[in-house]
């Protein structure tokens, strides 16, 4: 294959700016997929992606155009899935920057463009949705130049929906994106594993980009970090259906199957090379991202524990950013502490467990990872609030802080600043983007944005704001643990860590909310919030009262009192041994006790 005719590129875009539609048009125009087989969001293979209208998993497809071979690596646009984007960029030489002509640049697009520029990628600005009456391509061009600092005078104006000027995009890919550098088939194999997925018949299938050398069916290869060794049993490319090949060469993007059965044997981001002719240095992999949100997953039926474990292993194959470890809760039994990149990421995984593996589970309220220094100088990482040591053993607690970048219309700046201040934010900067839009920068505790920050931001700004963040490190905070007691018993899974200033109001809100969602039982249930031994709030869930006197007809009043007394004694006994049924809503109640809404 002539290496000068290969082009590897990604598409960078914010949610709803038309990335999946552009990918569909490219597949249609190049006849990679026949028109009769083409369906909307063709590269989005998960049902969840089509339903929500977002791309979650990256996908890679080979396209033939004239006498060129393109590898299009489709990427997600939501802030939680930045790790998928970083992997796509590591496998590309260039990127199409797709911007909605009616919306302009959004915060997430900005973050991904900077990521691409740091990787030395060639950027092609493309402005979409020019068919809409409210589009303003000239203003968007100006914004691209001023905000990102790249020349947009020859930005391509397209409508992915109608197919207008799509051919110009393909021509620009040929002219502007360089062919793969140093793509020599005779060098030792050097290939980046940028994704993997699980196939029930073939085991783990790797998606790879070959930088140097070649690999043939039957070759023995190994992962340079983990040193795990395998034989290549099948190779091929996606068009988007899988097409088998005897070999993959330098510059190509394809898939590799090696009968790998254990998910833990694969490390996405690693370099593979041949066992009998290894390359000296691995590729610089993309940064491995650490989870930022942790939650407990507990199967409703304890017999599903092993199935849950197996499912998490399979999902972590195609989603290497998930972490999980076994966890035990007095209230909920055996489960796992699972780490995610954000709340959407968590929702998607929960949905996948339910759909793909039929597992019903209870998810505890999400938490972030706190760094606790004890009085004897030991440093603990705590992501489960119930494990926080007693106050007298703690020297200091540090929590993760983020730098939030919010792009919004100027009329909402005041309201959003007020919300950020209420969430313990520290103002950093207010940048003028154009006549109507501003970029607001705040440092905020991650625990304050984890729950509903994004939803609140959208509702405050009528959906016009966009938001991106990066973690800047840990800072000391005055935090305390609030325990929840039901019927006098601490429920470990309901504990929360909050700032001292908000402890009383959060405790009060939580007891009120739990009273609403926990069903009434045959006995009275006190719901208490406590800091240490001190109860700071209390509500009572009233008992159902069974009418034990209904069968009496007239007769002696003492008979009536005797039956009521007997019922009371029975309830007392039930109270001492009675366990309270806790529905999933009780854990979600923690998310709805945000004091800044008041």
Curated annotation (Swiss-Prot):
> What reaction is this protein's catalytic activity?
GTP + H2O = GDP + phosphate + H(+)
Q: Record-annotated residues binding GTP?
A: 16-21, 128-131
Which Gene Ontology terms of cellular component type are present?
A: plasma membrane
Instruction: Indicate the principal place this protein occupies in or around the cell.
Output: membrane
Pfam families from the entry?
A: EFG_C (PF00679), GTP_EFTU (PF00009), GTP_EFTU_D2 (PF03144), LepA_C (PF06421)
Residue ranges occupied by any tr-type G domain in the UniProt entry: 4-181
Q: What is its EC number?
A: 3.6.5.n1
GO biological processes: positive regulation of translation
UniProt xrefs under SUPFAM superfamilies: EF-G C-terminal domain-like (SSF54980), P-loop containing nucleoside triphosphate hydrolases (SSF52540), Translation proteins (SSF50447)
A Gene Ontology molecular function term for this protein is: GTP binding
Subcellular location, record wording = Cell membrane
Could you tell me the keywords of this UniProt record? Cell membrane, GTP-binding, Hydrolase, Membrane, Nucleotide-binding, Protein biosynthesis
InterPro entries xref list: EF-4, EFG_III/V, EFG_V-like, EFTu-like_2, G_TR_CS, LepA_C_sf, LepA_CTD, LepA_IV
Listed NCBIfam families: lepA (TIGR01393), small_GTP (TIGR00231)
| Protein name, per record | Elongation factor 4
Q: Which gene underlies this protein? A: lepA
């Amino acid at each position: 294959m002539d290496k000068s005719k290969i082009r590897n590129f990604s598409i960078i875009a914010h949610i709803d700016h038309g990335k999946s539609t552009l990918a569909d048009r490219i597949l249609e125009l190049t006849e990679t997929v026949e028109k009769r087989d083409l369906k909307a969001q063709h590269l989005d293979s998960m049902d969840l992606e089509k339903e929500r209208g977002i791309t979650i998993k990256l996908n890679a497809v080979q396209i033939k155009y004239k006498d060129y071979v393109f590898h299009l690596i489709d990427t997600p646009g939501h802030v939680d899935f930045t790790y998928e984007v970083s992997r796509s960029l590591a496998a590309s030489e260039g990127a199409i920057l797709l911007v909605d002509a009616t919306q302009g640049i959004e915060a997430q697009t900005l973050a991904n463009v900077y990521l691409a520029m740091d990787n030395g990628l060639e950027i092609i600005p493309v402005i979409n949705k020019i068919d809409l009456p409210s589009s303003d391509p000239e203003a968007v061009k100006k914004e691209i130049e001023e905000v990102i600092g790249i020349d947009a005078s020859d930005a391509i104006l397209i409508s992915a929906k109608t197919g207008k000027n799509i051919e110009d995009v393909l021509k620009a890919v040929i002219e502007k994106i360089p062919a793969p550098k140093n793509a020599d088939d005779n060098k030792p194999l050097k290939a980046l594993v940028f994704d993997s997925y699980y196939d029930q018949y073939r085991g783990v299938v790797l998606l790879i980009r070959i930088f140097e050398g070649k690999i043939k069916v039957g070759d023995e290869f190994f992962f340079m970090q983990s040193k795990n060794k395998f034989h290549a049993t099948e190779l091929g490319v996606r068009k988007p259906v899988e097409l088998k090949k005897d070999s993959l060469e330098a510059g190509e993007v394809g898939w590799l199957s090696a009968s790998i059965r254990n998910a833990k044997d694969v490390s996405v981001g690693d370099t593979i090379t041949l066992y009998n002719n290894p390359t000296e240095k691995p590729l610089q992999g993309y940064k491995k991202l650490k989870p930022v949100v942790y939650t407990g997953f507990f199967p409703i039926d304890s017999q599903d524990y092993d199935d849950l474990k197996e499912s998490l292993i399979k999902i972590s194959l195609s989603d290497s950013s998930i972490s999980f470890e076994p966890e035990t809760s007095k209230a909920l039994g055996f489960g796992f502490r699972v780490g995610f990149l954000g709340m959407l990421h968590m929702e998607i995984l929960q949905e996948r467990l339910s759909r793909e593996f039929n597992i019903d589970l209870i998810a505890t309220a999400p938490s972030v990872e706190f760094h606790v220094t004890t009085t004897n100088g030991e440093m603990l990482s705590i992501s489960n609030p119930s494990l926080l040591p007693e106050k007298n053993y703690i020297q200091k607690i540090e929590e993760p802080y983020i730098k939030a970048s919010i792009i919004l219309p100027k009329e909402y700046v005041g309201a959003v600043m007020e919300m950020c201040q209420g969430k313990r934010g520290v103002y950093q900067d207010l940048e003028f983007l154009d006549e109507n839009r501003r970029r607001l920068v705040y440092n905020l505790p991650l625990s304050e944005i984890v729950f509903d920050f994004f939803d609140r931001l959208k509702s405050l700004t009528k959906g016009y704001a966009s938001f991106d963040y990066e973690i800047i490190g840990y800072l000391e905070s005055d935090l305390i643990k609030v325990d929840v007691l039901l019927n006098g018993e601490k429920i470990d899974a309901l504990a929360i860590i909050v700032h001292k200033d908000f402890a009383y109001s959060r405790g009060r809100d939580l007891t009120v909310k739990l009273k609403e969602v926990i069903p009434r039982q045959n006995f009275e249930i006190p719901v208490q919030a406590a800091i240490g031994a001190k109860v700071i709030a209390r509500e009572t869930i009233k008992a159902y009262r069974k009418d034990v006197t209904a069968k009496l007809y007239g007769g002696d009043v003492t008979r009536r009192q005797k039956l009521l007394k007997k019922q009371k004694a029975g309830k007392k006994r039930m109270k001492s041994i009675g366990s309270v049924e806790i529905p999933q809503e009780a854990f979600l109640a923690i998310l709805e006790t945000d004091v800044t809404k008041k």
